[in-house]
Amino acid sequence: KTPLQRLEAENAVRQFLDDFPEAIRPDPVDLRPFWLPDPGDVHILALAAVHHADAIITHNKKDFPQAELNTYGITRIDPDAQLLQLYKLHGTALMDQLRPVLAEVQSAHPQIQALELWRKAWLPQFGRKFDRL
């Protein structure tokens, strides 16, 4: 990452923590009973299981196999599909929240078209839906 990208990411994390202070759980969790193909992801499964999450939203199908998640009653959801589902449930309210975010990103990167931004974020289906509105 470039220094600018790192700074943007750090600012985004700070903003997220300001907006959702309860989202980060420092609770110690014993990772030993949990297994995933990538040991670096086990802490995510452990926290989700211990806190009775219904789902883990991730693009990473390979390292979060549904068969393993089923053991804990957790579903893996693709972020693109999740945004489409949220759109079905909350339509204009969701779009009203996303428009300023997209405008900010586009002002920082005016050379990139909106659909390309959605594609780079691995959200192509939702991006097409958003672009049609």
Region annotations inferred by a language model:
Residues A12-Q15, H51:
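Short alpha-helical scaffold segments that flank and stabilize functional sites
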Residues A9, F16, H43-I44, D78:
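Catalytic cores of nucleotide-enabled group-transfer and carboxylate-activating enzymes in metabolic
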Residues T2, D30, F34, L84-Y87:
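Residues at structural and domain junctions
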Residues K61-L133:
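Acidic, PIN/NYN-like endoribonuclease modules and their adjacent C-terminal/linker elements
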Residues F20-A55, V105-E116, K120-L133:
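Active-site neighborhoods of divalent-metal-dependent phosphate/nucleic-acid chemistry enzymes
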Residues F16-F20, Y72-I74:
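Short, mixed-charge aromatic SLiMs
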Residues K1-A9:
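A short secondary-structure junction motif
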